[in-house]
């Protein structure tokens, strides 16, 4: 069951599950949830009942769940009227169910890999599912280029795995839409493969003893990421690249020194000015490379090409200039969802409006600018679906308030701290997991402005693997007989 869970991660909107979850209006239906729920009920929970410890850093997570339940229960007393045919209780129940699915992914991923061998096997099974996803994405790119009509064979095959048809000029993999595929790549697969390459430790046998398979998968995955044309996904990858570049620049600057007897400048000491100069020069080069990368992407995506066109929208002034600029980038609709969610938070800052309920305030919270946007007009005229904040960070604020937001971010910080410790440890493969966790969290900072669902498995699994690695590291550091040999001193 564990292997099937990992292999099925790329399938995010399985049609039969979507029908069970809520019909055509439900798009988040990960097939991996089926083995995850079975594994939780048949193995994880029984292990807890036998006395196994809960995963590290579970306290803030359980506290967040308590806040979410309390906020959702209290939402029935708020002035939230039915909107687009949906009521508060139904929305809250469905939202809590998606959170339960996400927690299932986390706890199974944190509990099942109890040894380094299981952790390695987990990475191999993840790669099996990823190869299938990458192959299908490559087929999409090869057989449906540009604006050409999608062959019916591809369309019918894709409908077996997703409730949404393929996009003619963007790859989707097995996901609901290209941005979901990009999210899978930048918060799960690419971090693991990049971590393996940088740590020099592979879950597979190296090709000819030197070339890790993860390096090949990393290059393939980056190519597919570009073909998704997901701006947030690509920006997330660039964020990780910028952090790595800055860290490498800092370390290189520390190592570089002028030969002895040179570079002595009053008050700075030997070579310090030279080191600082090298760092600044490398940072300038890094910024230039990133800007050049954005410009190059703009040659393939007209939306990105307008990033540097600022002057025409400045005349609007104030927030109007911001909205006009985002509209120029074809991103204004997303910003409208964010602003609406933040206004809901301002009305209910302590506990929010309860999970799933931010959309009930959408009509009264939508900025005037939004009433001219086609997507907003369609929603206000009663289109199927329900408006969500479209950002995990905004959703946490709007639906769980300050308390829920702080608890969730504290939990993420704890996982990040655990990942950092793993990345600095002695066990080479645990360093892979630790580095991957850091890369995934860095990407999630940006990705949190794109997706807001709790039910998608990729982030939960990544955080669960980091937690499992922490437990394995703790077990390896204990004596074989489990006794504590730390000396204690008592006054005589």
Regions found by a protein language model. Name each.
Residues 1-81, 114-120, 124, 149-153, ...:
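Transmembrane signal-anchor hairpin modules in multi-pass inner-membrane enzymes, especially those
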Residues 7-20, 227-233, 390-400, 430-469:
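Membrane helix-loop boundary segments at the extracytoplasmic
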Residues 13-22, 82-85, 159-175, 336, ...:
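Juxtamembrane membrane-water interface segments that cap and precede transmembrane helices
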Residues 27-37, 63, 84-111, 130:
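Aromatic-anchored transmembrane helix interface
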Residues 65-69, 99-108, 120-168, 172-266, ...:
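Alpha-helical transmembrane segments of multi-pass inner-membrane proteins
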Residues 135, 141-145, 228, 244-326, ...:
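A membrane-periplasm/extracellular boundary helix in multi-pass inner-membrane enzymes
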Residues 242, 246-251, 387, 399-443:
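Hydrophobic transmembrane alpha-helices and their immediate junctions
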Residues 324-339, 347, 351-400:
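Long extracytoplasmic/lumenal interhelical loops at the membrane interface
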């Amino acid at each position: 069951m564990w292997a099937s869970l990992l292999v099925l991660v790329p399938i995010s909107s399985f049609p039969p599950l979507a029908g069970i979850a809520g019909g055509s209006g439900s798009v988040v239906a990960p097939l991996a949830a089926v083995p995850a729920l079975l594994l939780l009920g048949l193995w994880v929970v029984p292990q807890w009942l036998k006395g196994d410890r809960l995963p590290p850093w579970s306290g803030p997570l359980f506290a967040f769940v308590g806040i979410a339940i309390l906020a959702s229960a209290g939402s029935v007393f708020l002035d939230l009227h039915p909107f687009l045919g949906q009521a508060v209780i139904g929305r809250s129940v469905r939202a809590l169910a998606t959170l339960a699915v996400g927690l299932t992914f986390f706890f199974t991923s944190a509990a099942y890999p109890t040894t380094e061998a299981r952790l390695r096997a987990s990475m191999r099974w993840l790669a099996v599912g990823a190869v299938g996803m990458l192959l299908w994405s490559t087929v999409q790119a090869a057989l449906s280029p540009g604006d050409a009509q999608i062959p019916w064979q591809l369309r019918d095959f894709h409908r077996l795995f997703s409730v949404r048809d393929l996009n003619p000029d963007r790859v989707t993999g097995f996901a609901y839409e290209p941005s979901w595929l990009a999210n899978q790549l930048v918060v799960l697969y690419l971090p693991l493969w990049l971590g393996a390459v940088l740590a020099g430790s592979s879950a597979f046998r190296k090709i000819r003893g030197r070339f890790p398979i993860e390096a090949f998968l990393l290059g393939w995955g980056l190519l597919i990421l570009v073909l998704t044309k997901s701006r947030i996904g690509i920006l997330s990858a660039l964020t990780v690249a910028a952090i790595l570049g800055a860290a490498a620049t800092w370390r290189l600057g520390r190592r570089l020194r002028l030969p002895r007897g040179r570079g002595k400048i009053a008050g700075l000491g030997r070579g310090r000015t030279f080191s600082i100069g090298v760092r600044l020069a490398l940072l300038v080069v890094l910024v230039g490379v990133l800007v050049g990368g954005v410009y190059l992407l703009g040659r393939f995506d007209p939306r990105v090409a307008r990033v540097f066109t600022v002057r025409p929208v400045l005349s609007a002034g104030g927030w109007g200039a911001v909205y006009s600029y985002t509209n120029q980038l074809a991103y204004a609709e997303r910003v409208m969802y964010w602003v609406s969610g933040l206004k809901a938070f301002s009305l209910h800052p302590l506990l929010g409006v309860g999970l799933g309920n931010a959309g009930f305030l959408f009509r009264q919270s939508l900025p005037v600018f939004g009433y001219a946007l086609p997507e907003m007009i369609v929603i206000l005229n009663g289109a199927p679906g329900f408006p969500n904040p479209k950002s995990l960070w905004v959703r946490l604020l709007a639906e769980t308030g300050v308390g829920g937001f702080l608890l969730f971010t504290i939990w993420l910080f704890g996982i990040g701290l655990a990942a950092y410790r793993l990345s600095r440890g002695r066990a080479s493969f645990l360093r892979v997991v630790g580095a991957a966790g850091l890369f995934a969290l860095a990407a999630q900072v940006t990705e949190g402005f794109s997706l807001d669902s709790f039910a998608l498995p990729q982030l939960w699994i990544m955080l669960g693997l980091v937690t499992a690695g922490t437990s394995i590291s703790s077990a390896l550091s204990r004596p074989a007989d489990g006794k504590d040999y730390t000396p204690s001193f008592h006054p005589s």
